[in-house]
C-alpha cells in the first residue's frame, strides 16, 4: 500500500451490510476526530422493501432524501434519484473542505459521479486539498475510479479492519 491521502473502500454490488463506513465514522468521532462527509441510509418498510435512500451529513446529522421510488420505478426498475436533492447534499462536502476536517468519509460514487456529475467536483476538490478521503466505490466502477483519481489512491477492502490501519497512515495537512 502506498501512502496517499485518499482510498477507495471497494464493495461488491451484492454486499448486504454496508454499515462499515458509518461505523468507522462513528469510531473516529468518538476519538475526537473531525469527520465530514456523507453516508447513505437505505430506508425500508415493515416488509423489508426499499422505500428510499437518504444521504446523512456526518457533521450535522442532516438528512437529505435523494431517492423516493414510486411504485412504477420499483416495478420497472427505473432510476428515481432526485438530482436536485443530490445537488443539495454537495454542501456537506463543501463545508467539510472549507472547514478543513480531519477526514472525509463518503458513501457515494454512484452513477452520477461515474458520469462526472453529482458529487464529483467536491470529491476531486477534497483530493486536491489533501484532506484524507475514504470513499465507497462499487467493484464494477473501480477501474473508472482509478482513472479519475490518477490511480494514486489506495484500494481497501470494505471492512473496518482495512480502514483502521489506513487511517493511521494519513494526516491532514
Sequence positions of predicted segments:
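N-terminal targeting/trafficking signals and adjacent low-complexity tails
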Residues: 2-4, 70, 100, 145-146
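Substrate-engagement module of ASCE P-loop NTPases
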Residues: 123-139
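Helix-adjacent hinge/juxtasegments
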Residues: 58-99
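N-terminal phosphate/diphosphate-binding loop that engages ATP/GTP or pyrophosphate donors
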Residues: 24-72
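Glycine-rich P-loop/Walker A and Walker A-like loops and their local beta1-loop-alpha1 context
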Residues: 1-29, 33-35
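A charged, well-structured terminal subsegment
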Residues: 157-173
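Short Gly/Thr/Asp-enriched flexible loops that form oxyanion-binding sites at enzyme active sites
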Residues: 114-124
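Glycine-rich, charge-decorated loop segments at or immediately adjacent to ligand/cofactor-binding or catalytic sites
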Residues: 139-153
Amino acid at each position: 500500500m502506498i501512502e496517499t491521502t485518499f482510498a477507495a473502500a471497494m464493495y461488491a454490488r451484492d454486499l448486504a451490510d454496508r454499515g462499515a463506513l458509518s461505523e468507522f465514522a462513528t469510531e473516529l468521532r468518538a476519538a475526537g476526530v473531525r469527520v465530514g462527509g456523507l453516508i447513505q441510509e437505505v430506508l425500508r418498510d415493515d416488509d423489508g422493501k426499499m422505500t428510499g435512500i437518504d444521504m446523512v451529513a456526518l457533521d450535522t446529522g442532516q438528512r437529505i432524501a435523494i431517492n423516493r421510488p414510486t411504485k412504477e420505478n420499483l416495478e420497472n426498475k427505473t432510476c428515481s434519484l432526485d438530482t436536485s436533492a443530490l445537488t443539495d447534499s454537495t454542501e456537506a462536502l463543501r463545508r467539510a473542505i472549507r472547514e478543513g476536517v480531519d477526514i472525509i468519509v463518503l458513501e457515494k460514487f454512484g452513477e452520477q459521479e461515474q458520469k462526472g456529475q453529482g458529487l464529483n467536483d467536491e470529491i476531486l476538490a477534497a483530493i486536491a486539498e489533501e484532506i484524507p478521503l475514504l470513499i465507497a466505490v462499487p467493484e464494477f466502477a473501480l477501474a473508472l475510479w482509478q482513472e479519475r483519481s490518477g490511480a494514486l489512491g489506495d484500494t481497501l477492502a470494505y471492512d473496518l479492519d482495512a480502514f483502521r490501519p489506513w487511517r493511521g497512515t494519513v494526516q491532514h495537512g
